[in-house]
């Protein structure tokens, strides 16, 4: 999140400047003022519009700002509010930077650009009211998923290009396109945000000289300081495309100097498994000579977009596990691909539905990946426990909070009937699953009809309640028994959810294994999440090795998510520390049982 300007400068700006706003990239963990949250008023008043906002939950922090949910007192509409203390913004360049952000961003309005809804100040703070992007950014998606499928990458890249085309038509160079500045709304639509480094081209042929950008995405002409223009955004999109498909940035090293050297030398390699058409477009965008790169307006005419399958929508499940594309095999076949203009009509041309029972089963998540996740989690917990986080002179647990790491899925209910059938559970999206005693799994989606069946070897197949083989009849009957047992009223509400386009591509994480101790039940999901529910006080831990984070639900049902590395730095209360020690023992037990199981299979 970029620093805002001190209000003294803003007060001298034109009166209507206060109606603008600028999105900020909430980079949790960046240095900020610790006492900020205590000083911010609970009710915020925009003196121009007389709109009143009530401050809600913390969303993130970065630079000089903190971000909170704020709700309009009259309409109850919720926005993210970026709040900057004036006391921290005293330098002239900070004021200039904020003025530039506002003057640029207030002039923009596009489907794929973060919107703003207000900008005002009081004697102590500057407030910016933004468009809410509930699904965070592509950075969190990248941390959870690493390399995406090609159709997903194409889906996101197309929207990034459309947003950037709009910027360039309006003579704006973003200059800091990166995963963390590409936000996602509830429909997984991309919104370009954070215009802190953006600039306006004042005349044709103007070359900017400022050194700016993020190391992994910075263009060589910016590093050389010979002048740069619109082409830097195309370079950044090339880096983004590489990252989405390969799982890491093209020039990334552990040393900043080495990264810059690689960028200047154009030293990167594309793995052989990447589609040659995709590799070709990456190479076109990552040319050292900016004039040799395609313009932003030429990109969507590339074969990567015109001949490849682009989903009209993606399901929320894609944030944590790959989707399934077997429902549209003809669209994926190069010999029968629709042109971009047809695919991009979205809702007007939904993908053809196909009988679910004919879908090819999909096998995902190897044992090696699962063990790797558990090993990572064990190492993360070992590290935080070794720091003795509760034994500090000053514990600042709130500084370790990172809402961007909130889990996508967790188990909200469970019932143990393993003496006869298995363990039933409900996920937070109201889908219901059963891990049967024969090690097969069956999941009923929250639409009340779609089914996902996972065989003992991990092979997945997709069916419906109304269309399934007779061999599954008993298991579907048992699943319905579990479903009714786990609060019929709540699940009826879930079953009434209107299916949205893209849901036909959904795959849900499933329960891989579980066990009980005297103190807790331990649940291990296929997306790497480990959940521990404590019996005595009903507290819960939800651990994610991919985000290196823990969500703690205390006795009062307060839901807080922390980065483990920040708990190591800032400390935590004794209650959380003791549960983290217990969690390490349980993860070690999970890992040991998997290793023993694999040794048995090998012998």
UniProtKB/Swiss-Prot annotation:
Cellular component aspect of the GO annotation: centriolar satellite; centriole; centrosome; chromatin; chromosome, centromeric region; condensed chromosome, centromeric region; cytoplasm; kinetochore
Domain POLO box positions: 410-488, 510-592
Stretches for region Important for interaction with phosphorylated proteins: 538-540
Binding annotation for ATP: 59-67, 82, 131, 178-181, 194
Modified residues (Phosphoserine): 103, 137, 269, 335, 375, 450
Chief location bin: nucleus
Entries under Pfam families matching the protein: Pkinase, POLO_box
Region: Linker, residue numbers: 493-507
Free-text note regarding domains: The POLO box domains act as phosphopeptide-binding module that recognizes and binds serine-[phosphothreonine/phosphoserine]-(proline/X) motifs. PLK1 recognizes and binds docking proteins that are already phosphorylated on these motifs, and then phosphorylates them. PLK1 can also create its own docking sites by mediating phosphorylation of serine-[phosphothreonine/phosphoserine]-(proline/X) motifs subsequently recognized by the POLO box domains.
Protein name: Serine/threonine-protein kinase PLK1
Gene: Plk1
């Amino acid at each position: 999140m970029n620093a805002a300007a001190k209000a003294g400068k803003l007060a001298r700006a034109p009166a209507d400047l206060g109606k603008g706003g600028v999105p900020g990239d909430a980079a949790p963990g960046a240095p900020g003022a610790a006492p900020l949250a205590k000083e911010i008023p609970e009710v915020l008043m925009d003196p121009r519009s007389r709109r009143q906002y009530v401050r809600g939950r913390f969303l993130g922090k970065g630079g000089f700002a903190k971000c909170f949910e704020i709700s309009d007192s009259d309409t109850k509409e919720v926005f993210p509010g970026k709040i900057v203390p004036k006391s921290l913004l005293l330098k002239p360049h900070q004021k200039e930077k904020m003025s530039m952000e506002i003057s640029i961003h207030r002039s923009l309005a596009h489907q794929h650009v973060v919107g703003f809804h207000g900008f005002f100040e009081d004697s102590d703070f500057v407030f910016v009211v933004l468009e809410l992007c509930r699904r965070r950014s592509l950075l969190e998606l990248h941390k959870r998923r690493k390399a995406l499928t090609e159709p997903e990458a194409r889906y996101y890249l197309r929207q990034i290009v459309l947003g950037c085309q709009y910027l360039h038509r309006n003579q704006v160079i973003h200059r800091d396109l990166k995963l963390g500045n590409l936000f996602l709304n509830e429909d997984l639509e991309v919104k370009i945000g954070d215009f802190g480094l953006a600039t306006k081209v004042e005349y044709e042929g103007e070359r900017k000289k400022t050194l700016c950008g993020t190391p992994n995405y910075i263009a060589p002409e910016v590093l050389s300081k010979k002048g740069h223009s619109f082409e830097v955004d195309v370079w950044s999109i090339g880096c983004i495309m590489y990252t989405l498909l390969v799982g890491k940035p093209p020039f990334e090293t552990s040393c900043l100097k080495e990264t810059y050297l690689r960028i200047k030398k154009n030293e990167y390699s594309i793995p052989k498994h990447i589609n040659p058409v995709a590799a070709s477009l990456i190479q076109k965008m990552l040319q050292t000579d900016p004039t040799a790169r395609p313009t932003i307006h030429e990109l969507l005419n590339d074969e990567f977009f015109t001949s490849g399958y682009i989903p009209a929508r993606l399901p929320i499940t894609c944030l944590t596990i790959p989707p399934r594309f077997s429902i549209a095999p003809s669209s994926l076949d190069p010999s029968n691909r629709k042109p971009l203009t047809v695919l991009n009509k979205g809702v007007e041309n939904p993908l053809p539905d196909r009988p679910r029972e004919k879908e090819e089963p999909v096998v995902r998540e190897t044992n090696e990946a699962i063990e790797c996740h558990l090993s990572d989690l064990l190492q993360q917990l070992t590290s935080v426990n070794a720091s003795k986080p509760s034994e500090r002179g000053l514990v600042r647990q709130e500084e370790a909070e990172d809402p961007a790491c909130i889990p996508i899925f967790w188990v909200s209910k469970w019932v143990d009937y393993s003496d006869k059938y298995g363990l039933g559970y409900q996920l937070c999206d109201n889908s219901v699953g059963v891990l049967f005693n024969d090690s097969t799994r069956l999941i009923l989606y929250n639409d009340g009809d779609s089914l996902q069946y996972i065989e003992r070897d991990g092979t997945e197949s997709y069916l419906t309640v109304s269309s399934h083989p007779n061999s599954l009849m008993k298991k579907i009957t048992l699943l319905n028994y579990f479903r009714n047992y786990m609060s019929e009223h709540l699940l009826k509400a879930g079953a009434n959810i209107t299916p949205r386009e893209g849901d036909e591509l959904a795959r849900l994480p499933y329960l891989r294994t579980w066990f009980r101790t005297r103190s807790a039940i331990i649940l291990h999901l296929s997306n790497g999440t480990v959940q521990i529910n404590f019996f005595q006080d009903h507290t819960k831990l939800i651990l994610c090795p991919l985000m290196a984070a823990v969500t703690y639900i205390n006795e009062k049902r307060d839901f807080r998510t922390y980065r483990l590395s920040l708990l190591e730095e800032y400390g935590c209360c004794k209650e959380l520390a003791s549960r983290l020690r217990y969690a390490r023992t349980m993860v070690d037990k999970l890992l040991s049982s998997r290793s023993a199981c694999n040794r048995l299979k090998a012998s």
